[in-house]
From Swiss-Prot:
<dbReference type="GO" id="GO:0030514">
    <property type="term" value="P:negative regulation of BMP signaling pathway"/>
</dbReference>
<feature type="compositionally biased region" description="Polar residues">
    <location>
        <begin position="83"/>
        <end position="104"/>
    </location>
</feature>
<dbReference type="InterPro" id="IPR041885">
    <property type="entry name" value="MAN1_winged_helix_dom"/>
</dbReference>
<keyword id="KW-0472">Membrane</keyword>
<dbReference type="InterPro" id="IPR052277">
    <property type="entry name" value="INM_ESCRT-Associated"/>
</dbReference>
<feature type="region of interest" description="May be required for its role in BMP signaling">
    <location>
        <begin position="480"/>
        <end position="650"/>
    </location>
</feature>
<feature type="topological domain" description="Perinuclear space">
    <location>
        <begin position="252"/>
        <end position="400"/>
    </location>
</feature>
<feature type="topological domain" description="Nuclear">
    <location>
        <begin position="422"/>
        <end position="650"/>
    </location>
</feature>
<feature type="domain" description="LEM">
    <location>
        <begin position="3"/>
        <end position="47"/>
    </location>
</feature>
<dbReference type="InterPro" id="IPR003887">
    <property type="entry name" value="LEM_dom"/>
</dbReference>
<dbReference type="GO" id="GO:0005737">
    <property type="term" value="C:cytoplasm"/>
</dbReference>
<dbReference type="InterPro" id="IPR034394">
    <property type="entry name" value="Man1_RRM"/>
</dbReference>
<dbReference type="GO" id="GO:0012505">
    <property type="term" value="C:endomembrane system"/>
</dbReference>
<keyword id="KW-0539">Nucleus</keyword>
<comment type="function">
    <text>Inner nuclear membrane protein. Acts as a negative regulator of the BMP (Dpp) signaling cascade during crossvein development in pupal wings and possibly during synaptic transmission at the neuromuscular junction (NMJ). Appears to be required for pupal development and consequently transition to the adult stage. During pupal development, plays essential and redundant functions with the other LEM domain proteins; bocks and Ote.</text>
</comment>
<feature type="transmembrane region" description="Helical">
    <location>
        <begin position="231"/>
        <end position="251"/>
    </location>
</feature>
<dbReference type="GO" id="GO:0005637">
    <property type="term" value="C:nuclear inner membrane"/>
</dbReference>
Length: 650
């Protein structure tokens, strides 16, 4: 495991790796992480070297005879290879590096019993691991000069009755055969895995076998990986489905559309009795046995002609008729050299009979007596068309139907949108006309209160209320508003004036109309906010109210009375008003109530309301300030009750 992979591990994973490697449980922190990673890396490298040193080469030697003490030839060590990157491959190729070579081994008679082998199979360490043995007399130890040292005795014998080697004696700790004794307990299948045939074996089949085995194992692990299954399985299923559709398409495309539906096994007919006399007529009720084959052949030929005509009609040109006249069919049959002309008429009559008796052929005989102006002809009701033609026809029909439906739906949508747009435009025009009327009346009232000559040129009002960008759009609404005012409103006067030699139309407010009836009646509209900020404990009984009237209404004789009536309309009989004063300079209303609670009631009911398109605001005023400003009250104290308020409104 590389240092980069160890660095990418989390603290928990590194702690688990350390415990698995035999290290004590040590907490992983920022200061100890680098040291622990270095220890784990060294430990991993040492394990790899140890595993390489424990790999052995399996060799076997066929014994022709079984002497009590088998002898081995002298081993001449070849030149050692330059690179031992892979211990297993180097060990396996040991017998191929130096041509023909053998091992020289002998058994000590005084220390061990004879080794009974039918086919000697044992593990020998490679030359590079000779330093792993402590003893100098190990049977597998190799000196520095490349030759084996003096062999030692084998501490065990192998039982040939089963597949496992059984120890025959206690091995000394100093003996080098302990590894062989431990390896003898392994399954013989593992030994066969590394057992090579005698002689110079080629490495190419072995490598191919390994590559195949590794590829299969990688494929199995790839398929069994739970992280890959959610991504691989849907794609595999989709691929299989596409393959299935491709196969079905190929089968349908490869199917011959000219296949005749005439099945001789399911044929319906009645044979004529030769003893009965047959009357010569166009109507045939039975068929002779001799004419059956010829009638079937003619029926098949007729189906081919009709199917070809149907293909041309449905797939090429719809103007071509799919029907085939009997005379034309007879001429085509006569022109065919294979047709026997002698029995052509009888075969044709028999074919008509078979067509009538077998409606599953989808061949129709249209008689001329039923359709005036037409000759007798054949027609195929259900032709066998090619798949391409069928698909094209279905798609064309589908899009034709869908297109027609889309056109109908689009037509309805266009009509609906047009109606909605028309209604919206009409509503906007009506609102614009109404707004223009209100603006004109308010402007005329204001000009009438400000100047003595109330006449205004209509073009000036038009330039004021119609912006230059929207003038063309709102001009029709402006003209409608003027027409309605001229026709229905008597408060507005229209006239003509000559200015600079040009006649201009004017509009003015009629001052002769009673001001109380001209739309200046005080009227409450709606509150601007809720009662969350109302004052619970009013400090004084005096109030100062703003925006109940403006400077244009100062000259009205009944202004004070209308304001008092509007206040009584809101508060009713819940409070008593002692005095009401109007300040025409600041356009404010001053009220003095009988108590602080009465002033709080007026403040609660009126403050924050819209009154004649103006927002009312109220402020409490100290009694001393009120008396200093208005030392003299009104002539009569204003104590209003329910009946009095009703009388004022009536």
């Amino acid at each position: 495991m590389s240092t980069e992979s160890l660095n990418s591990l989390s603290d928990k994973e590194l702690h688990r790796k350390l415990i698995q490697s035999g290290f004590p449980s040590t907490p992983v922190t920022e200061t100890t992480r680098a040291v622990l990673i270095e220890k784990l890396r060294k430990h991993t490298r040492a394990d790899k070297l140890k595993k390489r040193s424990n790999k052995y080469v399996l060799y076997s030697k066929e014994q022709q005879e079984s002497p009590p003490f088998p002898q081995y030839h002298q081993y001449h060590a070849p030149q050692p290879p330059q690179n031992y990157a892979n211990g297993l491959d180097n060990n396996n190729d040991l017998d191929q590096t130096g041509g023909s070579s053998a091992y020289n081994r002998s058994l000590d008679e005084s220390d061990s019993s004879p080794l009974q082998l039918s086919a000697s199979k044992m593990y020998a360490p490679p030359p590079v691991v000779a330093s792993n043995y402590d003893g100098d007399c190990s049977p597998h130890s190799l000196g520095l000069n490349g030759k084996y040292l003096q062999p030692c005795s084998m501490p065990y014998a192998i039982d040939t009755s089963n597949n496992y080697g059984k120890p025959s004696g206690k091995a000394k700790l100093s003996d080098g055969g302990v590894v062989n004794r431990l390896l003898s307990f392994r399954d013989t299948t593992i030994q066969r895995k590394f057992n090579y045939p005698t002689g110079q074996a080629s490495r190419i089949p072995l490598r191919k076998e390994r590559l195949t085995r590794f590829a299969l194992s990688d494929l199995k692990s790839f398929i069994r990986n739970p992280d890959i299954r959610p991504y691989v399985i849907p794609r595999v299923l989709i691929s299989l489905f596409l393959i299935f559709l491709t196969i079905i398409t190929v089968l349908y495309v490869g199917k011959r559309f000219e296949q005749s539906p005439i099945d001789k096994a399911a044929l319906k007919y009645t044979l004529c009795n030769p003893n009965d006399m047959q009357m010569i007529s166009e109507k045939v009720n039975c068929i002779e046995k001799d004419s059956l084959r010829g009638a079937l052949d003619m029926s098949e030929e007729l189906f081919r002609h009709l199917n070809e005509r149907a293909r041309l009609h449905h797939c090429k040109d719809a103007n071509l008729s799919p029907a085939l006249e009997i005379g034309e069919f007879v001429r085509e049959m006569v022109s065919n050299p294979k047709t026997h002309r002698g029995n052509l008429h009888s075969n044709l009559m028999a074919a008509k009979y078979l067509i009538t008796e077998n409606p599953q052929w989808s061949i129709q005989v249209v008689d001329s007596t039923k359709h005036l102006g037409q000759t007798s002809h054949f027609e195929l009701s259900e032709p066998n068309l090619p798949l391409k033609c069928i698909v094209l026809k279905k798609v064309t029909r589908f899009f034709t139907v869908i297109g027609a439906l889309l056109l109908i739906v689009a037509g309805f949508l266009i009509v609906y949108v047009a109606v909605v747009i028309y209604r919206v435009k009409q509503k906007e025009a009506l609102l614009a006309v109404d707004q223009f009327q209100k603006d004109i009346i308010n402007e005329l009232i204001y000009l009438s209160s400000q100047s003595e000559s109330p006449e205004v040129v209509i073009n000036q009002l038009q330039e004021k209320f119609l912006p230059a960008k929207k003038r063309s759009k709102l001009l029709s609404s402006w003209n409608k508003a003027l027409k309605q005012l001229e026709k229905n409103d008597s408060r507005v006067l229209f006239g003509m004036v000559n200015r600079d030699g040009k006649a201009m139309r004017t509009i003015a407010w009629n001052r002769n109309v009673d001001k109380k009836d001209v739309g200046l009646v005080k009227k409450w509209q709606s509150p601007a906010f809720d009662n969350s900020n109302k004052i619970a404990n009013p400090p004084t009984p005096c109030l100062k109210i703003r925006h109940m009237f403006d400077s244009s209404e100062v000259d009205q004789a009944n202004l004070k009375q209308s304001i008092v009536e509007s206040i009584i309309e809101k508060v009713g009989t819940r409070c008593k008003i002692c005095d009401v004063q109007l300040d025409v300079q600041s356009c404010c209303v001053y009220i003095r109530c009988a108590s602080e609670e009465d002033a709080g009631t007026i403040h609660k009911e009126i403050n924050g309301w819209w009154f004649d398109k103006r927002l009312i605001s109220i402020k409490f005023l100290r009694l001393e300030r009120y008396l200093s400003r208005f030392p003299k009250p009104s002539a009569e104290p204003l104590y209003f009750h329910t009946n009095e308020a009703a009388n004022t409104h009536s």
